[in-house]
């Protein structure tokens, strides 16, 4: 539901500099120069560098390829949903009730997700529960990596945690998927406005 394109495990990489293509092939081919072998560039393939098993099945690759062929249509659909949310909730932001995503000037996005930031954790939890009671799935987005078990063990946090943890406590994702029904989208908008009109 949350990904713009999905295929199970796997993906596609876009390389805009030819000097990285060979390195990417080797990485994908478990550290071998197998792709060069299949092109007849080497007599046999060998282990030549770091790599892993990143190859997906042909069926999964075909499933992804079909989506990539429709990438513009998929992105436009998601952007329409994103823009509908953003427009519908702009008044709530103007009143200081919620915060909306900020897209810096000169930047574009692919509408991967739409989120709002509530005033605090308690409001977020109440909002998620209210939406659940109305058969709408809204979820919090992430737990800061520095507070995860591996983050505590291996990482560090530089500076003062003024935004990361507080924002993760406030952030909630709204339903965002290809071909969301217009009635469902309107319901999300109406129930969100209903909840926050009490704030």
Explain the meaning of each model-derived region.
Residues 16-199:
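PLP-dependent aminotransferase class I/II
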Residues 8-13:
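Glycine-rich phosphate-binding loop of ATP-grasp-fold ATP-dependent ligases
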């Amino acid at each position: 539901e949350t990904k713009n394109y999905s295929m199970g495990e796997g993906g596609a990489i876009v390389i805009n500099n030819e000097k990285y293509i060979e390195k990417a092939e080797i990485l994908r081919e478990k550290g071998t120069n197998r792709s060069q072998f299949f092109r007849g560039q080497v007599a046999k393939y060998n282990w030549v560098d770091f790599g892993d098993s990143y190859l997906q099945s042909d069926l999964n690759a075909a499933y992804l390829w079909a989506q990539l062929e429709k990438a513009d249509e998929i992105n436009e659909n998601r952007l329409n949903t994103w823009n509908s949310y953003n427009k519908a909730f702009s008044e709530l932001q103007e009143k200081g009730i919620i915060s909306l995503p900020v897209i810096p000037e000169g930047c574009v996005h692919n509408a991967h997700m739409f989120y709002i930031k509530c005033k605090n954790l308690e409001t977020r939890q109440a909002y998620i529960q209210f939406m659940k009671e109305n058969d709408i799935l809204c979820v919090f987005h992430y737990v800061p990596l520095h507070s995860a078990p591996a983050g505590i063990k291996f990482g560090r946090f530089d500076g003062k945690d003024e935004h990361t943890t507080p924002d993760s406590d406030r952030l909630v994702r709204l339903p965002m998927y290809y071909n969301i029904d217009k009635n469902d989208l309107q319901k999300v908008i109406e129930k969100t406005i209903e909840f926050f009109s009490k704030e």
